[in-house]
Curated annotation (Swiss-Prot):
CDD domains: CcmH_N (cd16378). GO terms for biological process: cytochrome complex assembly. The gene is ccmH. The lineage of its organism: Bacteria, Pseudomonadati, Pseudomonadota, Gammaproteobacteria, Pasteurellales. This is Putative cytochrome c-type biogenesis protein CcmH. Belongs to the CcmH/CycL/Ccl2/NrfF family. TPR repeats lie at residues 322-355, 393-426. Pfam families: CcmH, TPR_CcmH_CycH.
Amino acid sequence: MKKTWLFLTALLFSSVAFSAIDALNFSSPQQESDYHQLTQSLRCPQCQNNNIADSNATIAVDMRGKVFELLQEGKSKNDVVDYMVARYGNFVTYDPPITASTLVLWIAPLLLVLLGVVFLLRRKPKTQSAVKSQEILTDEDNARLAELLNKDKXMNFTLIFILTTLVVALICFYPLLCQFKAKHGQKRDDLNKALYFSRLEEIEQDNSQGLVENVEQLKQELQKTLLDDVPSKVQENVDYSGKSYGKIWFISGVLALGIIAGPSYFMVGSWQAESMLEQTYAKLPYFFDRMKNEDKNPFSDTEMQQFSTALRIDLQKNPTDAKKWWMLGQIGMNLGDARLAFDSYQKANKLEPDNVQYKLGYARILMFSEDATDKLKGGNLLREVIRQEHTNIEALSLLAFRYFETEDYKMAAVTWAMMLRLMPKDDERVPLIEKSIRTARDALEAQNEEKSKSITPEK
């Protein structure tokens, strides 16, 4: 008895499974291939997530039959698709045509990018005046100017944040603002009615040809199917009454996006670092005043770092100020940042190549380099300085050190002796230079003895 029930259950499910398979007689393999391709590429209007080949809905069965009928009439695949689109709308295809609503989704991101580019170009700093701001503005004016610039930047950030939020919200929530010409329920009713009359016409044709016997029963079944597919008015109102709240949902989505984006930026964004940089830059006039009393009140390491940061920001806005580049090089030397000093001195010398002070600072950093090419370039710069100023003690000192380093002890001693003649006798550096001269002469004698030994053959 148990085996009999299992057999009947299996037979029941197998009959249900095979009921979805259409028994069709194709005239050619190509026609069969076209049929399967079309049924897999057309979407079921009732199921929406399935194609008509996989759907068992009544409308899907009728659509499969219509596809077969049109192919039997010699229609092409494009003709079949055009027929289905004309009858059921663009929804039945998985590749709908481009419309105004789809263009918005494609063009909006490009417009957002173009808007950002235009904004960046408009923010490009204008050409700075040739007159230095420090000569025409007081410290109070500089402080007020920095405060105004900070307000403008905060206003720009707020406008960008609001604009970006609105554009993203429009792209994401645009469908909520769309006002459809017909409701979903009305479209479905019209589709079911059209299907009902089409099927009724087919039954009448089959009856006139004597292909069916129980015409009334088929009509009653068709009417029952129509009633089952069309829900009651109460259910229709309950299911789709919420569609009138599209604008409310849109506003809620925009607010939610702003609430999420704002705290997220303040948590992980770089606004704190940018704010600190702006505060440091605003202290630049204060650092210039401190330089006047640096001997009595020297800079601390922290203040030196802040001064360096403020100068960098200022040089980004006015990169042609050679004096500030030289000052940044001096700060780099005090901080022990050789790369900062090298780049700053190089920039200052490039902007004003005839300035002896800038050329001397660049030559000094080159002389301290371990690269032979840099040392050679530094020596050439020192000779240029001495040709411009024959009495430049610092240039002579660096050149004498260069001679001593290359074991040219004679020129080192001569250069130091020249420095002695230029310096006052009571100068604190005189004993050190005299000692350097003696060291150079001793090294020269040892060098000459070594040369004489190498020249004189041993007996």
